[in-house]
């Protein structure tokens, strides 16, 4: 019984480090303004709201990646500052400031656990 508890605890710890690694990779991709890397963490369908544009529900992964890449190019994104991170069950919220030419925009990312990793299901830049 003791061995089972130890193995279960180790398994839980290892998966929690994996989940934190996903979050760190997403934050680093935003800091580098790397839409392709961010796109790797998109779910199959993503709700996307970009600055001064209507929200698009259930945008496909590839289309969302292209839209984000175009946004980064148009706005000269230079970096990202994480403001907060909250986790509720298997859903996580990540908020921060996207640094562009001369100003910063608020960004909110909602992620959920799917297939053993965090995937972005909502992306809002305002």
Question: Where are the model-predicted features located?
Answer:
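Short, low-complexity N-terminal intrinsically disordered segments enriched in polar/charged residues
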Residues: 3-28, 32, 40
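Short, well-ordered alpha-helical segments enriched in acidic and aromatic residues
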Residues: 35-45
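Short beta-strand edge/turn micro-motifs at domain boundaries
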Residues: 104-126
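Exposed acidic/polar residues on beta-strands and adjacent loops within beta-sheet cores, strongest
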Residues: 24, 36, 81-90, 126
């Amino acid at each position: 019984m003791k061995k089972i508890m130890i193995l279960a605890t180790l398994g839980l710890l290892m998966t929690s480090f994996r989940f934190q690694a996903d979050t760190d990779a997403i934050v680093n991709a935003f800091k580098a303004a790397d839409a392709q890397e961010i796109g790797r963490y998109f779910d199959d369908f993503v709700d996307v709201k970009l600055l001064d544009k209507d929200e698009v529900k259930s945008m496909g992964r590839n289309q969302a990646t292209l839209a984000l890449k175009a946004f980064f190019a148009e706005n000269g994104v230079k970096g990202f500052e994480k403001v907060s991170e909250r986790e509720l069950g298997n859903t996580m919220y990540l908020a921060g400031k996207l640094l562009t030419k001369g100003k910063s925009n608020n960004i909110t990312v909602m992620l959920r656990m799917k297939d053993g990793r965090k995937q972005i299901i909502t992306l809002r830049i305002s």
